[in-house]
């Protein structure tokens, strides 16, 4: 009798374990595939996409910025485990191919965890990642990110190989364009794909291979917002980085570094993060009028400023000071650390009044 009871218990335990494993295997996450490339270096997927399960990345030519979502078709509920892609790099005028596993465990972890965003009331709300992005940079560099509302997180960096593809017979009129030299050159001269400003900036310059790996280096720094004339910082700002990542102050992992004890300025603890590419924030003047400031850094300048300050010690701490002038019309930016201050002067900025008031 005892032996029979033991057999029954073992069978029940095994059934529970199998059910648990099946539930784990059947976990579904809704997401969309998309791809990107650096501005000025458009690519087009010739064939393939995310693998196991397959999700195509054949969406036309990329025109967006590094790390940003692009075109997308379809939706999946299963975690991809690899990349099998052949793409045309127009700036290099060559094909690349990649066939590799990607960090599916990290993808699953990020899907399971999601991220917390603080609402206007201060309440933490759960948010989900909704896109998996594949980025293709010069030299066959491939980076994968996951993105949700106001949050982009890198999954991993991978490497493709340059290949040669001969034009196969029987292609339709569109497919033949991949092998048309005049068409490929025209893509690089198309201002809707490569803005004239970028065409002129890149003219007669070599392709900066390795640059997008350098953008992945993270430094210990923090943004500091200085609002003058009794103004007050609004609890609303976001940062995009050269490595394609994005954070928002409402992101709880970032909000935990913020101290609101100061009545007029937000104090933030330093954290390891890449060089910024954009910063947007808002504030109130002493009468309660709200202002918004958006800064787009010159990639070359901001990258050089950070590498200069950190060249002797990548572990030192620095602060990026954003100081609003007395009339709330302009923002000066400096990187400060190690007894040095380096002004950042080539950024584009827009400061304007908001309809919102205190």
What is each model feature region?
Residues 1-7:
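Sec-dependent signal peptide recognition
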Residues 46-89, 237-293:
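Tryptophan-paired
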Residues 95-101, 289-297:
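Edge beta-strands of extracellular beta-sandwich domains
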Residues 110-178, 192-215, 305-358:
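Compositionally biased low-complexity segments at domain edges in trafficked proteins
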